Amino acid sequence: MADAGWDRSADPAPRWRSLLDRALLGRANPGDLDYDGRFGSPTAPYRPGRPYDDEPMQPSNGTRPYDAPLPDGPARRGPMVEYQDRPADPNEQMVQVLRQEIPTPKVLAFANPKGGVHKTTATVLTAATIGSVRGKGVIAWDDNELRGTLGLRAGSARHARTIRHLIADLVRVENATGYDLYDMLDDYLRHASDGSYDVLAGEENPRFAQRLDPHTVRRVLELLRRTHDVICVDTGNNVESPNWQTVLQTADQLVVTSVPREDAAFTADWMLDLLDEAGMEELVANAVTLLSCPTPNPTPLIDDLAGHFRTRTRAVVVVPYDPALESGSNIEYPMLAPATKRAWLRAAAVMMDPYAR
């Protein structure tokens, strides 16, 4: 991977400057943007296999609803016809996606080399959302090499053990099986206050990063796959780290996080170029972009960014501002506003839709 372009400098691209110029002028119409011939015209937005409609379902099999007026007289009550192919409630459609069987455990990598772009928040809230629906089998791992805060913001502080302690005992834990494996691994995990997901906290000592070599990272991920169905990984900021690169190479789903700021979105775009050049075109094409609103009033730039990232990734989801997240302290999913929960439910469903059976 060292020769695959990881250390390429982030030179501004014409398509990016065109995008920002239009946003600054207030012309936030993605269809009018010049995307540069290198990428062609914007692709159609991703449409999941289970459409998340806002309108209730109407019967589509030719059967009249049970109360509908008959041609010769008033409505007659007959046997209720149940339509089970799609639920009427769009929230229930998304819940069904998250409840589906997952044939093999999936690793979701949350990435953007820029700091302060809500990687940790997105990792935690995705784990919390999926875990609240599935009830078990979801974990958030803070794989940030430089004093990540996921372990502080999520999970109960029932102990101070981190990834460092797990790696010190990794051989012993790997050799466990069945319930013994779950019990043994649990000694190194923290838990959400509502029990919806587990947390593997990162290590605060920066010297420990040297011990997270690619082989060790793969062993940890394989261990977590034995005990969990969904592994959400906060990847940190260092794209040159073998640790970061290994997680991206191993991931099933890339989640690009950003906020509506030029520097944050440009860095995300540069990262996608980097991954393309490193041979991860399929991971990039299947990626989901999360745009988080850090203030109550969305800026015009967010529409332009959404239009741009639709040309680069499978889907774009915008999640709203929520005052419960503003303090930067503990992330408590139950405290979020209903609209915020719905947005994260949709985001999680879009991420998991390709893998649900």
PLM regions: where:
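Beta-strand-loop-alpha "switch" segments that mediate conformational coupling across diverse proteins
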Residues: S292-P338, W344
